[in-house]
């Protein structure tokens, strides 16, 4: 099955969003991927969340840009990055953002994989932390090997909803929209996502990365 076949039925622009390849030592150890290298695409995040929205798109871009800041031209190592969420796990869209970050980085909360053997090799648990209130951004990423860390902030106002949404969204949410209005609502919804992950994917005014000092 090709990527095109697998993503059939999804908006075509998903394939235009930036993807990321990581090396996963656990996948290599257990023979799940050649050399442990795996590529993640925006469609994978959509499958995980069950939907595509500005939050999922923002989480995707924040994690990608955070990893690029940490690793530069080197390939990021999955399972070797801690994810710090500023807010509590049940606060707003924090859980959605954390799920996307976990998909990409492999970082899991206390319920995650505890590792292999007495040395707990390749453990992923306790790498995803909530309530790190000192963050200036939405999330932070820290390399386990070097300790280098960054914080990432998203400014969604860079890509606002069109004026047409002001009337459509309340009708769609309340169940009062017609079939034609619902189709238009979905079209406008995904168009904002498209602008984020395609047109503004490298926009540093939307996704802002800065150094983070972790005690």
Predicted features, each with a name:
Residues 1-52, 61-215:
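Non-transmembrane, aqueous-exposed alpha-helical and coiled segments at domain scale
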């Amino acid at each position: 099955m090709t990527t095109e076949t697998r993503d059939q039925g999804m908006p075509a622009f998903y394939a235009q969003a930036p993807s990321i390849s990581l090396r996963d030592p656990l996948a290599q150890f257990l023979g799940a991927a050649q050399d442990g290298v795996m590529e993640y695409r925006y469609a994978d995040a959509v499958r995980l969340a069950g939907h595509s929205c500005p939050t999922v798109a923002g989480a995707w871009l924040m994690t990608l840009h955070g990893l690029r800041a940490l690793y530069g031209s080197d390939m990021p190592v999955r399972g070797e990055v801690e994810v710090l969420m500023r807010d509590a796990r049940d606060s707003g869209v924090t859980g959605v953002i954390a799920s996307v970050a976990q998909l990409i980085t492999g970082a899991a909360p206390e319920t995650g994989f505890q590792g292999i053997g007495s040395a707990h090799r390749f453990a992923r648990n306790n790498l995803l932390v909530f309530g790190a209130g000192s963050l200036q951004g939405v999330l932070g990423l820290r390399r386990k090997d070097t300790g280098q860390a960054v914080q990432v902030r998203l400014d969604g106002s860079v890509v606002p909803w069109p004026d047409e949404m002001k009337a459509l969204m309340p009708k769609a949410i309340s169940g009062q929209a017609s079939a034609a209005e619902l189709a238009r609502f979905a079209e406008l919804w995904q168009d904002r996502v498209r602008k984020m992950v395609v047109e503004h994917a490298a926009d540093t005014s939307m996704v802002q990365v800065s150094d983070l000092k972790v005690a």
